[in-house]
Amino acid sequence: MEKVFHLGLCIDDLKGAQLAIVPGDPDRAARISQFLDNPTCLAQTREFHVYLGQLNGHSVVVCSTGIGGPSTSIAVEELAQLGVRTFLRIGTTGAIQPHINEGDILVSQASVRLDGASQHFAPLSYPAVSDFFATQAMVQACKNLNIDFHIGITASSDTFYPGQERYDTHSGYVPKSLQGSCEEWQNLGVMNYEMESATLFTMCAALGLKAACVAGVLVNRTRQEIPNVDHGEIEKKSVAVVLEAAKVLLG
């Protein structure tokens, strides 16, 4: 097999890995890789930094996706071409329900499709839903580690500012079609905003792949917009969850 276009890897490079942990941040990918046995950097191309290591005796990939659905879809597609079948996303998030605390872990069952990339895989009537067993592994991981978590629906937006109804911007303006949208999602029980899960869930379900998503809460937007918590500690907690979930799935 020839090398895939963006990652620059061929199937032999992954040594049979069928599970990938997919953060957005390349630096976070590097940090996660250090929890694997014998980690090796396979590629560093644009936002895609790819590492291979061993977990419970199985080959596991860690690949950063960058921010948002379009680049996430590239990473997932090319990893799938290389044999990966399960994708565990790890990220950070802003909660919009008042009972959720900073530092809590959110496990996404499904996503509101506020993105555009997912529509290139299935129409809007198709649900952006996680894989049941991969999501159950995330839940089990939180329980195993005695970490406070919530499970529910996530709003997944293409944009960080207008799509999440943020007014702390250059213009301070949000288009009328999005004004009041945060309150609407709150009233519908949506837990949080992020920017990748709708694309990840939709494309994986449509392509016969498995996906789950976990995110650490940096801020609760019902109280404030700017995080003032220790990002590093929240990252450590969410990384612990995704690694434990991977172990559950790998057996």
Where are these regions (language model features)?
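Glycine-rich beta-alpha junction loops
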Residues: 26, 94, 155-161, 199, ...
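Zn-dependent metallopeptidase/amidohydrolase metal-coordination segment
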Residues: 198-230
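His/Asp/Glu-rich mid-to-C-terminal helical/loop segments that flank catalytic regions of hydrolases
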Residues: 221-251
